[in-house]
Every structure is written in C-alpha cells, then in structure tokens.
C-alpha cells in the first residue's frame, strides 16, 4: 500500500521518465520473484525488508534519471537548439498548392470561358462567262469565337481565313465586338459589326452553312466580293426592345466610320482611319408580332458622306425595307432598297434600286428553293459605274446529309445590260465543326 501511494504521488515529467519507471517496475518484479530462490540458497542471510527494497529501487531510478539528463545535455551541446522536424515533401505538396488549385478552380468557375465553333465550305462551280474556268474553290473558313466576360459583358468575334482570286489565303477579322447587355431594352456593342441594313445582313453572317442558298443575294455581297452596301462598320451599335406589347417592336441605332468610296483600295472597311470626319449613322426599326411567330417586318435609314479622290463629296442615303417569314420548314424572304447618291455642287441625284425574293420549303432532309434578284445602277453612277443592270433567277436544292453537313446544288441565270447572259452551276459542300 505504501508503494502504491508513493507511485501515485510521483509523476514522471516526460515520456523517457515513464520508460525508466517501467524498467524499474520490471526490476522490482524480478527481485520479488528471485528473492525466494535467494533465500533458499542463502538461508543464513536475513531477508531484506520492504523499505530496503523500495529504497534500492528509488536509488536505481535516480541513477537512471541522472544518466538521462547527462545524455540530453550532451546532445543539446553538440547539435545546438532543437529544430522542429520538417514534414516530408509528399506532405508539403497539398499545403503548398492548395491555394493555387483553389484560385484556378475559381477562375474556371467565374472567369471568361472561350468558345470556338468553325464553319467552312468547298465548292465546284462553272459558267459560260468568257474568261472563267470550272474550278474547285475553298470557301471562307470561319472561326466563330464567343466568351462571357462577365454577367453583363460578352465578347464576340469572327476570324475568317479566305482565299482570293490570286489563290493566296488571307486572314480577316470580320467581326470583333465587346457587347454590354443592360436589359431587354438596351444593349450596346462596340467594335466591328454587320450594319443593320435590312434583314439578311444581320441574320446571316460569314457562314454558308446557315444560308439556304449557295451564296448571299447580290445586294448583300461582301465588300471584297463586289458588294455595293456598307456590310461592315467600325463603331458602336445600340439595340433593344421597344415596349409595344404583342407588336414586338425593336430598334437599332449605329454610329461608325462607314466604308470607303468603293475605290480599288486594299480594304473597303475603315478599321483604323476614316477617310473624313463625317460619321455614318444608321437607324433601324422592326417588328416581330407575337400573334404570328416567324414574321418580321422593318425598315432602316443609313446616312454617310463619301469622299472619292479628285471628286466632290457625295451624300449617301440608303433606304431599306423587308418582310420575311421564317419557320423551320418554310422560308420566305423579301427585301427592297434604294441607294441615293447626291454629289455636292451638282443638281443631279443618282438612285440605284434593288430587291430580291427567296422562298424555300423543307421536305425531310431536302429543301428546294428559288430566288429572284434585281439591281439597276446607271452607267454614269459616280460610285457604282461597274455594277450596271443585273437580274435573274436562281434555283437550287439543299440536302441535309447530317446535322452538321449540307450539300447544295444551284443553277443561276443572270441577265446583264448590253452583255450576254451568264449561266452558272455550283455544287457546294458546307459544314460546321
């Protein structure tokens, strides 16, 4: 009982003392077990008392404690202050990279995500036009790029790889826009955009795969293909809904550099420098009645001042109107416009009218279509002297080979002023990727 009380009062200071206490206990038990044998062998010696045994054990424990202290002192003098044990490299990796991984995941969740979709086509075409040859041609390869910059801001771009008549392939940034969407009634886009003249120019961009026919109507041909409209513009475009109930009114207001005076320049779109200080302005209004889904009617007014070399400045006004009805299995497009050129200092005003109509109906994977187009520019028109009169029908068939591939076969007959009519046949393979 005395031993138990003593052991309860004496508490080791550290783990090493506990170890030596266990050793002392083992010695004590061994002594108790061996004492009968010793008494039997040495009957003449009196047996030791319990107090003497305890005193002997305490003496040994004290000796062991003293030795441990000496060893600890020698170790401290030889190695200096004790250093914390470093974690193994494998344990340090998660601690070191966890914040980086969290930041990267946060950027993936909240930062801009770039999305790219591609469109292109390959055509085989031939005609009876003098000087032309039957050829395979690479169409525009369009990389349509979008990104959600933030909740309100978005990025949109069309990067086009295109071969010219010299067989060289060039790269053009056809659209590049930073778009801000405040609500359904106001959105603002800044950069290079497709001018909201009529319907076709903002409904179909740089991809023949979206279009029913092989190509765009002549009125809406791109500038570098001989088009007469300012298809592209660099500036700002605001758009949105107009509170009008079931009438579904929308507006577009645009201000930009406009296009050059259709001279043989390397670039018709004024991407960096405007040829004059006057800015082109375009106002458009259209309706999408809720009672008849697919119907859209509207008009637009475009105003600019052209500055051709060695000629007086020319005021340009473009009035356009459209009525279209587009459903998944049926399409009917109708657009008409007139381009007014008024040279300063002259009393004569030049008007160039044009229109097209296109209708198609889908039957399963097949969609036959018909288009008729017309444009008539005066021979002495100051800007469109090379356009003249051209009109005629186009008949074609589009076959949906898959959800991403379409085959088109189209025949065109074009009548020209004081020149032979042109008959052409085109086979096109258009696809998206």
Where are these regions (language model features)?
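Interfacial loop-to-helix transition and helix-capping segments at the boundaries
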Residues: 269-278, 314
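Outer membrane beta-barrel
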Residues: 102-261, 277-282, 286-293, 358-369, ...
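N-terminal periplasmic/intermembrane-space "pro-region" immediately following the signal or transit peptide
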Residues: 37-125
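Outer-membrane beta-barrel pore domains
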Residues: 130, 168, 176-181, 189-192, ...
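N-terminal secretory signal peptides that target proteins for export/translocation
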Residues: 1-20
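Bacterial N-terminal signal peptides
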Residues: 21-34
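Active-site-proximal beta-alpha loop/turn segments in soluble metabolic enzymes
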Residues: 254, 258-272, 304-308
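Glycine- and other small-residue-rich loops at beta-strand/loop junctions that grip anionic moieties
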Residues: 227, 274, 348
